[in-house]
Amino acid sequence: MAKKVMAMVKLQIPAGKATPAPPVGPALGQHGVNIMAFVKEYNERTAGQVGLIIPVEITVYADRTFSFVTKTPPASVLLKKAAGIETASGQPHVKKVGKVTRTKVREIAELKMPDLNAADVEAAVRMVEGTARSMGIEIVEG
């Protein structure tokens, strides 16, 4: 018989740098999960993606065991990395803060495809372009 699910916890944690400190500790501690076991396993699984923020969905079972699924990094994080900027624009329609080529947007869309609710890559590209526009990043041909 399948284990009884007690809780679903969603967090965004820097890859390879999870620690028992907030936000991980309190989020998992209240469900009685072995925090160090999660931290060790998460850091091992995300060691190759250091520098990115990786969303993770943790399923906590009634016997206090857990399983987790890592997702692809948020489009905004990938766009900021591609444009070489630290923060997005506070006024995206007035102040542009960076530029990204259309080919780079397509690469990001293809990477994000498993987590996006898009029928094809073209729809995913339009979603990523919309995110870029709302961040004040200009999309240029190339």
From Swiss-Prot:
* SMART domains per record: RL11
Q: Which domain of life is it from?
A: Bacteria
Q: Where is the signal peptide?
A: none
The record's annotation in PROSITE patterns points to: RIBOSOMAL_L11
A GO molecular-function annotation: structural constituent of ribosome
- Give a yes or no for keyword Ribosomal protein in this entry: yes
Alphabetized, the UniProt keywords read: Methylation, Ribonucleoprotein, Ribosomal protein, RNA-binding, rRNA-binding
Q: Which family does it belong to?
A: Belongs to the universal ribosomal protein uL11 family.
The UniProt subunit note reads as follows:
Part of the ribosomal stalk of the 50S ribosomal subunit. Interacts with L10 and the large rRNA to form the base of the stalk. L10 forms an elongated spine to which L12 dimers bind in a sequential fashion forming a multimeric L10(L12)X complex.
Q: Which NCBIfam families match?
A: L11_bact (TIGR01632)
Put simply, this protein is called: Large ribosomal subunit protein uL11
Q: Which species is listed as the source? A: Desulforudis audaxviator (strain MP104C)
| Source lineage | Bacteria, Bacillati, Bacillota, Clostridia, Thermoanaerobacterales
